[in-house]
Structure formats: structure tokens, C-alpha cells
Amino acid sequence: MKIGYFCNITNWKKKSYTEILDNARDIADYCDKNNWNSIWFTEHHFNHEGMESSPNPLMICTDVAARTKKIRLGQACNVITFWNPIRLAEDIAALDHLSKGRVEVGVGRGIYGREALHLNIEADLKDQAKNKRLFEETLTIMKKAWTEKFFSHQGEFYTFPAPDFVWQHDLSPPNEDFVDLKTNKLNVCIVILTKIKLS
């Protein structure tokens, strides 16, 4: 059996943010030293009730990765409808490298409308069908970024590479897999930093 710790960083008692983060670090250190399998951090924004203390679980996981040796680092969850899918895929891949492969990826659609309205209007929870389509497209792009050497995507919400983008980097050697050698328009996007195991 594997046991993980759900570390929902909250601030019900209105402590200083430094104290809140130090407490989360202490919990992570304890779990690492006592052979817990994983620790999981949440994502919340604009929450005056006390749950706003973890707006970016990847940054928290990066800090914990530098302080621990064995424990796996999870996000419960990355609200992927709020983020650019390529940027999020890169950040998760970078964390996987920094932690030496200890990342557990959790993704979700969000639960608070006030978060969606201020971070990505397309993710508005009043339109659940649209939110679900955005979630599915974002996850598809992230999976492409992690598993394909080169990729392109054209969907309802995102198009990569951007239409009519012209590559003008003189130091890059010509590569027709990457760019149309006649027009210099990108054929694909490259964001691979690591191969994330999808299961």
C-alpha cells in the first residue's frame, strides 16, 4: 500500500504567508523522512475564506523537491483550464527534471467560478460543456508536448504553432521537419523537456 499526504495549504487563522509555507515545508520534510509515498498540493485563487495560500502547486512542489530526497510530488490539482497548455507542460516537465523524476501529475477543471472568470474567461464554469471541451483540448496538447518530438495542434481554443508565424532565428540550422524552408513558417511546436509517463 502507498500512502500520500494531501497538503491543502490553508490560512484560516490569518498567519503570515512565510509561516504558512514553513509549515508546509515541515510537513513535507516529515513525510519524506518517514517514508510517505507522496505529498499533494492544491491550486486555489482569490479565496478570502483561507484556501488561497496555494495558487501554484508546481512552485510549491519545486521548493519541496529541493528540500526532500524520496517523496513523490503531486498536484491535486493543476487547474489546467486556467493555464496555457504549452507553458504548463513545460513547467511540469521542468519540475520532473528538478525532482529527478518524482512528479505525480494531477489535473482538473476547477470548482470556483470566481477563479475561472479572472484567470481564463473561456473556463467559465457557468458553461460546463465549454469548460469540459477546454479541459480536454488543453490535456490533449499537454500530452502531445510530452510524447511527440514535434507536434502541431489546431482546435477550438488553441492553434500551435500560431497561424502565419515566421521563424527568423539565424542561428538555427535549417530543418524541414521544424520549419518550411521556403516560407520559414513553423510546421510544428517543440517543447519537449522530458518524456512524462502517461498511464
What label would you give each PLM region?
Residues 7-21, 78-86, 185-194:
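Active-site mouth loops of central-metabolism enzymes
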Residues 24-27, 61, 71, 76, ...:
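Short, flexible coil/linker segments at or flanking structured domains
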Residues 84-199:
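Internal, glycine-rich beta/alpha segment that forms the wall or movable "lid"
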Residues 36-43, 72-80, 108-114, 140-146:
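Low-complexity, flexible helical/coil segments
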Residues 5-9, 43, 75-77, 107-109, ...:
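A cross-domain feature marking catalytic cores of carbohydrate-active enzymes
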Residues 1-67, 71-72:
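N-terminal beta1-alpha1-beta2 module of alpha/beta enzyme domains
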Residues 48-53, 78-83, 127-130:
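Glycine-rich "substrate-gating" loop/helix at the edge of Rossmann-like oxidoreductase active sites
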Residues 2-4, 38, 70-77, 102-106, ...:
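Structural preference for beta-strand elements that scaffold enzyme active sites
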